């Protein structure tokens, strides 16, 4: 009989929300609403919040807006909740500066995306992440692999080379591959906590050794995701599977077009006026919005 696998730690909890950035009618960041939404997400089961990542529209936020968002959310939720700042860039120098600023502004960690557009080789990726890790050694890092957006994938073997950086503690796997979890665990060992970057792959990734999820759907179904995770961890696999199947249509709807367009509409439909995304993203079209409204209504009845 094979020995039992060693489970990974959970440096940021199990359910993290990749938080939207609210805008007012003039397109300005609504920091007051951001604080209220952050507290609501925690009340609904999130143990951590990721501020100014992909869902937070980081490409269209200034660095000043991002720093203030971090400070507002940090103050809103208090010290008992993990707050991660999106500090990635395709410029290593810019990412280093942003990560240092996040550490100084009270972040519990940084989500650092693979550099986009310039398509560095694996050796360049290793050097990039090592420079960031060394620049803020006190700040735990979550490496973020999302090749569908960046055009480059961080190989498990490259991640393994970074395991001698003590603050490289976690990995957001958003390549769409369940096998990536196993490959990361085999290459890096259990010290690297792998988080699913896709709500729809959370349950199968948990079975492969992931510790949790950086979620979009938790904006509107946080308690149900928490219930699914807890059921799986307690051995109630049928209960977890039932939740997964009930939530799958919502997972699909939230990515029927570019994130965060649908989730912002879902929040609006749920009473949170977070505003439209900034250009070049657009509000959800009326047909998709109507379909999403029907899904949310049906879920409230189950």
From Swiss-Prot:
Active site: 144 (proton donor/acceptor), 172 (schiff-base intermediate with substrate)
GO molecular function: 4-hydroxy-tetrahydrodipicolinate synthase activity
Residues at which pyruvate binds: 55, 214
Family note: Belongs to the DapA family.
SMART domains linked: DHDPS (SM01130)
EC number: 4.3.3.7
Any single Pfam family the record assigns to this protein: DHDPS
Function: Catalyzes the condensation of (S)-aspartate-beta-semialdehyde [(S)-ASA] and pyruvate to 4-hydroxy-tetrahydrodipicolinate (HTPA).
Root EC class: lyase
Pathway listed: Amino-acid biosynthesis; L-lysine biosynthesis via DAP pathway; (S)-tetrahydrodipicolinate from L-aspartate: step 3/4
Signal peptide range in chain numbering: none
Localization, UniProt: Cytoplasm
Subunit structure: Homotetramer; dimer of dimers.
Keywords (A to Z) from UniProt: Amino-acid biosynthesis, Cytoplasm, Diaminopimelate biosynthesis, Lyase, Lysine biosynthesis, Schiff base
Organism superkingdom: Bacteria
UniProt source species: Synechococcus sp. (strain CC9311)
GO biological process: diaminopimelate biosynthetic process; lysine biosynthetic process via diaminopimelate
CC per GO annotation: cytosol
Site (Part of a proton relay during catalysis): 54, 117
Catalytic activity: L-aspartate 4-semialdehyde + pyruvate = (2S,4S)-4-hydroxy-2,3,4,5-tetrahydrodipicolinate + H2O + H(+)
Protein name, entry field: 4-hydroxy-tetrahydrodipicolinate synthase
């Amino acid at each position: 009989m094979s020995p039992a696998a060693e489970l990974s730690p959970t440096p940021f909890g199990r359910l993290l929300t990749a938080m939207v950035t609210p805008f007012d009618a003039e397109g300005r960041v609504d920091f007051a609403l951001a604080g209220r939404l952050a507290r609501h997400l925690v009340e609904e089961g999130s143990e951590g919040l990721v501020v100014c990542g992909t869902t937070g529209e980081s490409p269209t936020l200034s660095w000043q807006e991002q720093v203030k968002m971090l400070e507002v959310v940090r103050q809103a939720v208090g010290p008992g909740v993990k707050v991660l700042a999106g500090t990635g860039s395709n410029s290593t120098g810019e990412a280093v500066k942003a990560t240092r600023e996040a550490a100084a502004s009270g972040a519990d960690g940084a989500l650092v995306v693979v550099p986009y557009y310039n398509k560095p080789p694996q050796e360049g990726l290793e050097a990039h992440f090592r420079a960031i890790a060394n620049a803020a050694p006190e700040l735990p890092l979550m490496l973020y692999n999302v090749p569908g957006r960046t055009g480059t994938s961080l190989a498990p073997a490259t991640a393994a080379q970074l395991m001698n950086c003590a603050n490289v503690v976690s990995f957001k796997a958003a390549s769409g591959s369940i096998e990536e979890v196993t490959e990361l665990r085999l290459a890096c060992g259990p010290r690297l906590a792998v988080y699913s970057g896709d709500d729809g792959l959370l349950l199968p990734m948990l079975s492969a050794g992931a510790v949790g999820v950086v979620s979009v759907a938790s904006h509107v179904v946080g308690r149900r995701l928490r219930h699914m995770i807890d059921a799986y961890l307690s051995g109630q696999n049928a209960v977890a599977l039932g939740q997964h199947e009930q939530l799958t249509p919502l997972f699909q709807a939230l990515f029927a077009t570019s994130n965060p367009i649908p989730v912002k509409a879902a929040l609006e439909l749920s009473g949170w006026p977070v505003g439209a995304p900034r250009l070049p993203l657009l509000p959800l079209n009326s047909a998709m919005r109507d379909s999403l409204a029907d899904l949310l209504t049906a879920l409230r009845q189950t």
